[in-house]
């Protein structure tokens, strides 16, 4: 899993890939600096809307994690950014992804 490998290269630990069905939008569970993360990975050809934000927010609670993140190779719609701000969901867009990839080399 590319996202899981990328997290490992960026000093995340206890990385666990969830099952595909029934995961409530959570693809990966991870930890960094004693903070636990529920992460949804989206590899899309268009910007990410607020459905992903709502899913990961729900999934964070289900898995009892500290932080909810949506990681994507794209950007987020204005509505998604507003939703994420209201629900305290971290948005890691293609710029953040690029920074994470640069940490590998």
Feature locations, PLM:
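Mixed-charge (Asp/Glu-Lys/Arg
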Residues: 1-105
């Amino acid at each position: 899993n590319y996202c899981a490998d990328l997290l490992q290269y960026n000093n995340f630990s206890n990385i666990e890939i969830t099952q595909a069905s029934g995961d409530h939008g959570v693809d990966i569970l991870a930890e960094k600096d004693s903070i636990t993360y529920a992460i949804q990975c989206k590899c899309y050809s268009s910007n990410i809307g607020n459905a992903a934000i709502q899913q990961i927010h729900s999934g964070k609670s289900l898995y009892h994690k500290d932080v909810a993140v949506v990681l994507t190779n794209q950007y987020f719609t204005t509505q998604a950014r507003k939703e994420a701000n209201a629900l305290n969901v971290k948005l890691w867009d293609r710029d953040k992804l690029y920074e994470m990839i640069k940490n590998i080399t």
